[in-house]
Regions:
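PP2C/PPM-type serine/threonine phosphatase catalytic domain
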Residues: 1-400
């Protein structure tokens, strides 16, 4: 109230005691200074803590190796880079193998059961260094669990290499058929030897019988040579060749309701039951696969092998799991991949501003980027069309 009575006489005989405005201003300034000092102290403490945390994160980051993955994301090119260490250059050259790109996503499934293998120059028919090598591409679509597909990813190319080197007659059918038989035998023996004991392999069924007997995988494998495109398929994954804009299927899906497969299953004593589609004994939606010991002899690992001569009109090869082919036709997939490869051929306008050398360097590897873009675009198309399975796509540039 003293402030409100400033300059007003209280009585006639009593002296006035006005409150000086300067005292109020000084007190208000002192209060503001206290608030500013308090905020400054908090800011300094927070800044110090933030700097301390950033320094700790930087030290931890320097102690960990960083993974460097090129655009192709092939395991052959995976390198570990440690601080102070120069990265090692790859021994493979761009001219030694076709350009490729791949994508493998879980999609709408809870678990990822697909696997992809790409092995450029994995095998040579003779030891001549000037002789171009053979290139291996594989897509494996597991079911029941992921360990059979992972085992195929780890071992199939090595088995195929051994069979090719043993085969002196260039009999591709025999070499690849024997490879698939060996792969199936390895998967079965591994399950029996492990019995009920778990191994280092982490998977849903923990490699325990009888759950392990209900696990299998499709396999579509392609060996690309300078003159041939060899495709071996077991299951409902698929390989499609794009030649001069025309989609040419290089494999046939092994479905239980295919007339020849239906006859084979019934002659072996099995039945095809239509339960959410045609299924062997009402359980498996494919008639051939690696693994699935509980459905033998109705489900067999014998592949169908096709050998196609390469021509100058060949544009690209597409290998994919049924997560793509269930919703995208051969013609659409070939058209999308072809469009990506053709668009990559168009030269980009060179940058005129200084400091953009990286943009120019990136255009030199446009073929790899084109294959990767094609695989990504096909995967996005499958997901947009509500594919309910894992989606794995490999695109190989066959243009010479």
């Amino acid at each position: 109230m003293a402030g409100m009575c400033c300059g007003i006489n209280v009585g006639e005989n009593e002296p006035t005691s006005p409150v000086e405005p300067a005292s109020r201003t000084a007190r208000r300034r002192r209060m503001e200074l206290r608030q500013i000092k308090f905020i400054t102290d908090i800011a300094d403490t927070t800044r110090f803590k933030r700097r301390k945390i950033e320094d700790q994160d930087e030290q931890q980051q320097q102690q960990k190796p960083s993974l460097i993955l090129p655009a192709t994301q092939c395991e052959n090119f995976l390198t570990l880079k440690f601080p102070g260490e120069k990265p090692k250059e790859s021994t493979l050259h761009d001219d030694d193998f076709p350009k490729f790109g791949y994508t493998s996503v879980c999609g709408r499934r809870r678990d990822m059961e697909d696997a992809v293998t790409i092995r450029p120059s994995f095998c040579k028919k003779d030891d001549s260094k000037n002789q171009p090598g053979f290139h291996f591409y594989g897509v494996y679509d597991g079911h029941g669990c992921s360990h059979v597909a992972k085992r195929c990813k780890e071992r199939m190319h090595a088995i195929v290499k051994e069979e090719i080197e043993k085969n002196d007659d260039d009999d591709w059918t025999q070499a690849l058929s024997q490879s698939f038989t060996r792969m199936d035998r390895e998967v079965g023996d591994r399950a029996k030897n492990n019995g009920g004991a778990s191994t280092s392999t982490s998977c849903r069924c923990e490699l325990q019988t009888p759950q392990c007997d209900a696990v299998g995988s499709t396999a579509v494998v392609s060996v690309v040579t300078p003159e041939k495109i060899v495709v071996s398929n077991c299951g409902d994954s698929r390989a499609v060749l794009c030649r001069k804009g025309v989609a040419i299927p290089l494999s046939n899906d092994h479905k239980p309701d295919r007339p020849d497969e239906l006859t084979r299953i019934e002659e072996a004593g099995g039945r095809v039951i239509y339960w959410d589609g045609a299924r062997v004994l009402g359980m498996l939606a494919m008639s051939r696969a690696i693994g699935d010991n509980y459905l033998k002899p109705y489900v067999i690992p014998d592949p169908e092998v096709t050998v196609t001569d390469r021509t100058s009109d060949d544009e690209c090869l597409i290998l994919a799991s049924d997560g793509l082919w269930d919703v995208v036709s051969n013609e659409t997939a070939a058209a999308v991949a072809r469009m990506c490869l053709i668009n990559a051929e168009k030269p980009a306008s060179p940058p005129r501003s200084p400091g953009n050398e990286a943009v120019v360097a990136a255009t030199k590897d446009s073929s790899d980027k084109a294959c990767s873009d094609a695989s990504i675009l096909l995967t996005k198309l499958a997901l947009a069309r509500q594919s309910a399975d894992n989606v794995s796509v490999v695109v190989v540039d066959l243009r010479k």
